């Protein structure tokens, strides 16, 4: 997303944080149903915005004043979605969007964050983040399973059912819901990358950046601590490590933070040597 869209997403996220916060004296169990409904409502609105070009253009029309766009949202959605979800949608449509399609993607991301807020309230955000990452790695190591979940010819219900059988009772309910949504959304593309993206969103809610570390050997606690400190210093931010065992690395480690790769592996050095020989 470009500047205007990022600012509008940030404004809507601020409202989401307010409507999903656990009130003082309340418990996660008492707020979870409402937060879950907000997440579902935001997902439904994202689907509406994505599937109805006329609605999408009207809700993002830069020529209309913000109050006109929020009024339209209230008329379209009032009484059909929760007050919390409507507040988030109103904040979103009040902003400016670099592209009309960005509103849909923002609402999808906010729906994910609302789902993660439920895990956060239950002090299970770390667990969900790790499970999403691990499930993605399991798919990466099992091509047949990955194909079954991405086969365009397979019914969506069959793919969702497969995820349910794999994770039900083995993962946190929030992890299960997010994984089901990931395989159900045909437009998200690579399911492994989508799961990794969801894991990064979970980490971002805790104010941390995810560093995916590929290594050929198991790292002990001291090595992990030193590596985490070094990467945090390099990027100047708190880092959450996710370790991916990969025999193809051959030695050393390869670190990826978002699209940036810090590669200090034997594999990289061999590749550089090969390039030198071919010149």
Curated annotation (Swiss-Prot):
InterPro entries: ATP_synth_OSCP/delta_N_sf, ATPase_OSCP/d_CS, ATPase_OSCP/dsu. One of its GO terms (cellular component) is proton-transporting ATP synthase complex. It holds the Pfam family OSCP. Keywords: ATP synthesis, Cell membrane, CF(1), Hydrogen ion transport, Ion transport, Membrane, Transport. NCBIfam families: PRK13430.1. PANTHER family: ATP SYNTHASE DELTA CHAIN. Belongs to the ATPase delta chain family. This is ATP synthase subunit delta. The gene is atpH.
């Amino acid at each position: 997303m470009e500047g205007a869209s990022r600012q509008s997403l940030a404004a809507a996220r601020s409202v989401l944080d307010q409507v999903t916060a656990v009130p003082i004296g309340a418990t996660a169990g008492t707020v979870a149903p409402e937060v879950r409904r907000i997440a579902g409502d935001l997902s439904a609105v994202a689907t509406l915005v994505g599937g109805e070009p006329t609605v999408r253009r009207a809700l993002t029309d830069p020529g209309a004043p913000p109050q006109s766009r929020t009024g339209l949202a209230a008329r379209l959605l009032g009484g059909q979605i929760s007050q919390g979800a409507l507040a988030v949608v109103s904040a979103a449509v009040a902003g400016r969007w670099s592209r009309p399609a960005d509103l849909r993607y923002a609402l999808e991301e906010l729906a994910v964050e609302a789902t993660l807020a439920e895990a956060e309230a239950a002090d299970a955000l770390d667990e969900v983040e790790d499970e999403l990452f691990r499930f993605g790695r399991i798919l990466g190591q099992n091509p047949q399973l990955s194909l079954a979940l991405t086969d365009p010819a397979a019914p969506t219900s069959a793919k969702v059912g497969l995820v349910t059988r794999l994770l039900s009772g083995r993962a946190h309910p929030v992890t299960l819901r997010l994984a089901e949504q990931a395989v159900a959304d045909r437009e998200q593309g690579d399911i492994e990358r989508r799961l990794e993206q969801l894991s990064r969103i979970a980490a971002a809610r805790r104010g941390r950046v995810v560093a995916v570390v590929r290594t050929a050997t198991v790292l002990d606690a001291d090595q992990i601590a030193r590596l985490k400190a070094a990467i945090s210093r390099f990027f100047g931010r708190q880092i959450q490590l996710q370790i991916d065992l990969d025999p193809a690395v051959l030695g050393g480690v390869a670190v990826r933070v978002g699209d940036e790769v810090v590669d200090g592996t034997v594999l990289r050095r061999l590749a550089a040597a090969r390039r030198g020989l071919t010149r």
